[in-house]
């Protein structure tokens, strides 16, 4: 069974258990296959937040490549579970904000990564979300990974998460990355925070997320599978 099929099977099991009343924590441990590095059998989750007007490539490329690498990924709709992107593509998200919040309330150790795509007005809507803010606070507190691309690093900047960090964003948003050390690059990783410039950097951004979660070998396997340069 290939890695993509295994991940698909795990997601199906996860969702089936969520629909029962056995509790999120139990479902998370039964339905997911991504084990913690400490080998204690704990399971982790990646949350990708989508708000009205999000940039589709920047959101779905990370979802696709992370799942190819075997990561457990859930899309979270801000304001609704059906979210329409900047170019008219509507996505039926896996979770509502309330469901996502409940999931980390019951299993805070499951928060492995939070990802914010850019796009307009998607980025502005992400910045207004209390749920997104809560997830970023929780991720920063526990040292979980945070990924943001295009205009979305401005959401991190507004929360002071980029002070003293190397970062990059869509041209023109630099002043919103308060305290950051702006670099001229497509993708920049500084510790647990990964930023990318724009839609054209979506594949490299996603591969960097894979590398952070699963290691460079996994990222290279995905790169080879999609024939990325």
Language-model features, listed with the residues they occupy:
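Extended, subdomain-level signal for the structured scaffold at the beginning of enzyme domains
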Residues: 30, 34, 39-142, 155-158, ...
């Amino acid at each position: 069974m290939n890695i993509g099929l295994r991940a698909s099977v795990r997601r199906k099991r996860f969702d089936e258990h969520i629909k029962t009343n056995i509790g999120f924590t139990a479902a998370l441990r039964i339905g997911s296959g991504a084990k913690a590095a400490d080998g204690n059998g704990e399971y982790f989750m990646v949350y990708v937040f989508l708000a009205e007007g999000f940039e589709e490539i920047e959101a779905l490329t990370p979802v696709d490549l992370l799942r190819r690498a075997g990561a457990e990924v859930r899309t979270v709709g801000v304001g609704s579970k059906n979210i329409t992107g900047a170019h008219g593509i509507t996505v039926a998200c896996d979770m509502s904000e309330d469901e996502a919040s409940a999931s980390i309330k019951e299993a805070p150790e499951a928060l492995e990564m939070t990802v914010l795509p850019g796009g307009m007005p998607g980025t502005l809507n992400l910045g207004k979300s209390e749920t997104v803010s809560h997830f970023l606070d929780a991720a920063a507190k526990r040292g979980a990974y945070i990924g943001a691309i295009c205009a979305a690093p401005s959401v991190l900047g507004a929360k002071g998460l980029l002070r003293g960090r190397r970062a990059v964003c869509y041209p023109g948003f630099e002043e919103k990355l308060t305290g950051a050390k702006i670099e001229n690059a497509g993708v920049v990783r500084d510790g647990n925070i990964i930023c990318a410039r724009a839609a054209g950097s979506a594949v490299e951004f996603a591969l960097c997320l894979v590398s952070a979660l699963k290691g460079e070998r996994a990222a290279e396997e995905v790169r080879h599978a999609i024939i990325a340069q």
